Amino acid sequence: MTEAVSNFEAPPMSRRVFLNALLSSSVGVVVVGTLYPVVKYFIPPSSGGAGEGVIAQDALGKPISVSELLATHAATDRVLAQGLKGDPTYIVIDNGAVANYGLNAVCTHLGCVVPWNAGENLFKCPCHGSQYAANGKVIRGPAPRSLELVSATVDGDNVRFSPWQGPDFREA
């Protein structure tokens, strides 16, 4: 039986078959190399492990220090940070402490970033005039919904954002 296997010879590969295989492989590598960044662009960044969330970061990508934040901001301020999936998210300061919730800063009408207006104690969308209360509840349209809630917890000297669990307390 070993003699039958040892006498077997593979047919020689012709030059045409070799060049076709080489060309097909080269085209495949170029196509995969071109499509990879395109596909990666459409996949949102990870927001951390399930339930773990992400550490709030400033505009430069550095973690925000809670002690520094509370020392430099008013007792009822809203501070813009980088939150879940890289979305702009407000850290809510109530009575001089970080609240247990944060607010996604993206307007629910057309996706503009909504700035905090401390003088009027509300959020005003610069695109179409939607207004939100200090807790993110919509008070004037055309926005159809309140700003999205995220859970905010103090983790050492950092703020950790995670997806909001449970009912919306603003709808009571």
Swiss-Prot record:
Binding site for [2Fe-2S] cluster: 107, 109, 125, 128
Reaction catalyzed: 2 oxidized [plastocyanin] + a plastoquinol + 2 H(+)(in) = 2 reduced [plastocyanin] + a plastoquinone + 4 H(+)(out)
Listed GO CC annotations: plasma membrane-derived thylakoid membrane
Cofactors demanded by this protein: [2Fe-2S] cluster
Cystine pairings recorded for this chain: 112-127
UniProt remark on cofactor binding: Binds 1 [2Fe-2S] cluster per subunit.
Membrane spanning residue stretches: 17-39
Enzymatic class: translocase
Membrane-topology annotation of the record: Single-pass membrane protein
Main location: membrane
SUPFAM superfamilies: ISP domain (SSF50022)
Note, other: The Rieske iron-sulfur protein is a high potential 2Fe-2S protein.
Subunit composition and interactions: The 4 large subunits of the cytochrome b6-f complex are cytochrome b6, subunit IV (17 kDa polypeptide, PetD), cytochrome f and the Rieske protein, while the 4 small subunits are PetG, PetL, PetM and PetN. The complex functions as a dimer.
Similarity-based family: Belongs to the Rieske iron-sulfur protein family.
Name recorded for this polypeptide: Cytochrome b6-f complex iron-sulfur subunit
Organism this protein belongs to: Synechococcus sp. (strain JA-3-3Ab)
Gene that this polypeptide is encoded by: petC
